[in-house]
């Protein structure tokens, strides 16, 4: 495995002081981060999330997606539980990178949905991989998870690596008039498990 643990430090946030653990992929050069809060019992399921980098949503407060809302809600949920983790993976734009994501947004501005835009650029709908989570989870000492996600691929990925997903915790947050179509596409074409209320006009916040 090409993932190497580098260092850890404290990370004060609005939701508490997390521990930040840095990892480097020697093959790709990408740097991944695990955030942890609290003390873990190896036999108890720990609340957590696998979160793929989204500069536009996480840092620039974009309303085109639900990523930033999911990250903040996950951190808040972990703080309320008193323990938990987030694996922050550098897989911008479902794995196509930031500039290609902007190209995809340009196509979406012209009427394509998020899947069609990726495919027109020559990419699969979702290019992400999750094998890097194995050494990350080993380093932070977690094998049983209550996973905050709407994406069944993340559940299957964890299970395929021998991690026990005791519960899937839905994260249906961040719906607004700019991302209703995006959320619907994630549900109908990417298989994300969301209630229809979360992406329909009738369920508008």
From Swiss-Prot:
Naming one, the record's GO cellular component terms include: cytosol
UniProt xrefs under Pfam families: GTP_cyclohydro2
- Kindly list the positions annotated as binding Zn(2+): 54, 65, 67
Q: Give its E.C. classification number.
A: 3.5.4.25
Q: Where are the transmembrane segments?
A: none
Arranged from A to Z, the UniProt key words for this protein are: GTP-binding, Hydrolase, Metal-binding, Nucleotide-binding, Riboflavin biosynthesis, Zinc
- Cited InterPro entries: GTP_cyclohydro_II (IPR032677), RibA (IPR000926), RibA-like_sf (IPR036144)
List of catalytic residues: 126 (proton acceptor), 128 (nucleophile)
Q: Record's Gene3D superfamilies?
A: GTP cyclohydrolase II
Which BP terms in the Gene Ontology apply to this protein?
riboflavin biosynthetic process
Give an example GO molecular function: GTP binding
Pathway this chain belongs to: Cofactor biosynthesis; riboflavin biosynthesis; 5-amino-6-(D-ribitylamino)uracil from GTP: step 1/4
Q: Which residues bind GTP?
A: 49-53, 70, 92-94, 114, 149, 154
Q: Which reaction does it catalyse?
A: GTP + 4 H2O = 2,5-diamino-6-hydroxy-4-(5-phosphoribosylamino)-pyrimidine + formate + 2 phosphate + 3 H(+)
Q: Which cofactor does it need?
A: Zn(2+)
Question: Could you give the cofactor binding note from the entry?
Answer: Binds 1 zinc ion per subunit.
* Similarity section: Belongs to the GTP cyclohydrolase II family.
What task does this protein carry out?
A: Catalyzes the conversion of GTP to 2,5-diamino-6-ribosylamino-4(3H)-pyrimidinone 5'-phosphate (DARP), formate and pyrophosphate.
HAMAP family reported for this sequence: RibA (MF_00179)
The identity of this protein, by name, is GTP cyclohydrolase-2
The uppermost taxa in this organism's lineage are: Bacteria, Pseudomonadati, Pseudomonadota, Gammaproteobacteria, Alteromonadales
